[in-house]
Amino acid sequence: MPENSPETMTRNRSIFLLSLGCSKNTVDSERLIGQARRKGLSFTNEPDEADIVIINTCGFIADAKTESIDEILAAAEKRKNGEIEALYVMGCLSALYAAELRAELPEVDRFFGTADLPEILNILGTAYDPATRFERSLLSPSHYAWLKLSEGCSRTCSFCAIPKMRGRYKSESMEDLLQEATRLKAKGVKELNLIAQDITPYGLDLYGTSRLNDLMRELSDLNFDWIRLLYAYPLDFPLEVIDTMRERENICDYLDMPVQHICDRILASMKRGIDKQGTIGLLESIRKRNPNIRLRTTMIVGYPGETRAEFEELLQFVREFRFDRLGCFPYSHEEHTAAYDNLEDDIPEEEKQERVGELMELQEGISEKKNRALEEKALKVLVEEVEDNLAFARTEYDAPEVDNECVLDTAGIDIRPGDFCMATIEESSAYELVGRIKNVIP
């Protein structure tokens, strides 16, 4: 550890926290800031004004690792030059590669894993308080927030190192989640996005069965305007959730369910626990139970051994099923995974990228047609930003950060971020709706 250890720092130091990666990481960062601020510590949004820098890293795929390492290196240079007094690194990358990072980056004062909030607070000169563990300072716009239902994952997907980074699946209690949600509601949050590494088995470890549906009903009763479900695993998904979604007006007709692939051989190699027939049957059941639902999914292409015929099978599935939202990643050969240990990364990177492009071009055409069907219709939207005479908003069918944007002429109406309004859609493209605001919803 460098000289002038920051463990004895006084409370007049300013802290900058850089949160990288997914929304689960964001929640971890919000909890750290919330607890620290509650104890009187000061944070800044400007890295150049900080005495202490904390980087919450992502280690999921190669691109995320590279971004995390680049940010650490930049901050380490500041630490080396005396521009900051301390540098701490936390999160998934730190959990997975702590020993290697310590050896390569002596400028970093301390590395922490994903469950080290008490230790981080301690080194900042304050104490962890279990009674306020859900105290959060939101990093998202104040009108929406993430509610993390669990920590870790007990699935054994061959391409994923999340269980190594975050441990086995551990649900938060319903009581704690309802308490946290109540606090978020009091902060003015209107849209609650339910997240986890996997929301499907929520409660199984605590109650012996999935309690996702029960939790949704309880959260719905708290009167959020929108409640949204993200990161649902296909295997053992509780279909009663879709019935509740259809019945409850404030639960968005939206489900994010990454299926990753459709070829039986690849699904088996991925250790997904579900085959093509089971996947299609589940998705058809979901649409049958709620015809108005919008389904988002994620695919991986270029998985080891993926033949052209297997990729064509995936294309045909997407062509026929017509997902409402779809993202695609090229396979990333990650250490600490079964695929890395047992399979050869034999698809050239150029070929992977070509397959990503081909699949996304197909989806673009599907999305264009689906959005065109919304033209001349009036939709309820949530305003995200206002700039001059334009408002940028989302429908209930679009999650924050990843889905479509709705660009609206405010028509002189006084509108602010966080407002709901009715909008008439006049034009569309694959990933954007364009229209005008009819009226603000009180």
Curated annotation (Swiss-Prot):
Please report the stretch or stretches of sequence annotated as the Radical SAM core domain: 139-369
An annotated Gene Ontology molecular function: 4 iron, 4 sulfur cluster binding
Domain named TRAM: which ranges? 372-439
Q: Which reaction does it catalyse?
A: L-aspartate(89)-[ribosomal protein uS12]-hydrogen + (sulfur carrier)-SH + AH2 + 2 S-adenosyl-L-methionine = 3-methylsulfanyl-L-aspartate(89)-[ribosomal protein uS12]-hydrogen + (sulfur carrier)-H + 5'-deoxyadenosine + L-methionine + A + S-adenosyl-L-homocysteine + 2 H(+)
Known cofactor(s): [4Fe-4S] cluster
UniProt enzyme class:
transferase
Q: Name one Pfam family in it.
A: Radical_SAM
Q: Which family does it belong to?
A: Belongs to the methylthiotransferase family. RimO subfamily.
Biological function: Catalyzes the methylthiolation of an aspartic acid residue of ribosomal protein uS12.
Task: Return the protein name.
Answer: Ribosomal protein uS12 methylthiotransferase RimO
Q: Which organism is it from?
A: Chlorobium phaeobacteroides (strain BS1)
